[in-house]
């Protein structure tokens, strides 16, 4: 698309539309209004924005081949048969997480910040399950709003669902945000998910309300390996 041609076409169309409502006979009034149109007083200037091109990094298959990621993780993070290629900041985040270091990711919208933590979390879970360790809540992700938690849950479940991994190795993701029924809360307490998505208000309630279900959910996170604050700002 030719952006400047489109901008000119859009404004011209809008000008014709706005002029079509009246026919001005007075020459001096028409001249004054024409001057306002010519000065662009009825629409804002074009807003130009440059989208950065993020530095490219290895593919998920590259990290599997180097031993940095489990083969099962390589099956999760793909688009069909095509392996996911990481940006450099994503690969650096994966390396930080594998080293056990805390880190903060600050990068642009649409740059794949969620993969910076989901990839090492999923990899840690798959390795633990492959080693025969019992399921326990190894990661808690705290979101500022339920809508974000809901969309992220759909996204990671889509990746896991298309992986073809056996159920014994598939990470289980559950949501504990206050939207769940009592029955669902009971199931989460009785069968700890590998990844628990919550919001900051529910996270506080888990630590302070301490009814029997909440206490069990917290107990299920004994040995927690990841706590992630999304949209920290």
How would you name each of these model-derived features?
Residues 179-196:
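Conserved motor-coupling elements within RecA-like helicase/translocase cores
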Residues 123-152, 165-169, 222:
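Conserved SF1/SF2 helicase motif Ia
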Residues 1-92, 171:
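Helicase-associated low-complexity/disordered flanking segments
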Residues 103-106, 140-141:
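Short hydrophobic/aromatic beta-strand immediately N-terminal to the Walker A/P-loop
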Residues 115, 136-159, 180, 201-205:
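Conserved Walker A/P-loop ATP-binding site and its immediately adjacent core
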Residues 95-103, 115-134:
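Walker A/P-loop NTP-binding motif
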């Amino acid at each position: 698309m030719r952006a400047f041609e489109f901008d000119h076409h859009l404004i011209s169309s809008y000008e014709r539309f706005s002029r079509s409502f009246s026919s001005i006979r007075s020459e001096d009034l028409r001249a004054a209004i024409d001057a306002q149109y010519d000065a662009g007083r009825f629409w804002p200037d074009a807003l130009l924005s440059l989208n950065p091109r993020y530095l490219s990094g290895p593919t998920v298959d590259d990290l599997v081949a180097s031993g940095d990621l489990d083969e099962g993780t390589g099956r999760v993070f793909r688009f069909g048969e095509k392996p996911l290629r990481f940006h450099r900041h994503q690969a650096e985040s994966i390396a930080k997480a594998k080293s056990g270091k805390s880190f903060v990711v600050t990068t642009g919208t649409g740059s794949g910040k969620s993969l910076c933590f989901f990839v090492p979390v999923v990899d840690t879970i798959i390795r633990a399950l492959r080693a025969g360790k019992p399921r326990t809540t190894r990661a808690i992700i705290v979101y500022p709003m339920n809508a974000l938690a809901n969309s992220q849950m759909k996204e990671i479940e889509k990746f896991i669902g298309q992986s073809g991994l056996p159920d014994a190795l598939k990470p289980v993701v559950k949501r504990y945000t206050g939207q769940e029924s009592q029955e669902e809360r009971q199931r989460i307490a009785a069968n700890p998910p590998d990844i628990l998505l919550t919001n900051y208000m529910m996270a506080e309630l888990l630590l302070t309300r301490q009814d029997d279900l909440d206490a069990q959910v917290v107990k299920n996170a004994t040995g927690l390996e990841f706590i992630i604050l999304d949209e920290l700002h």
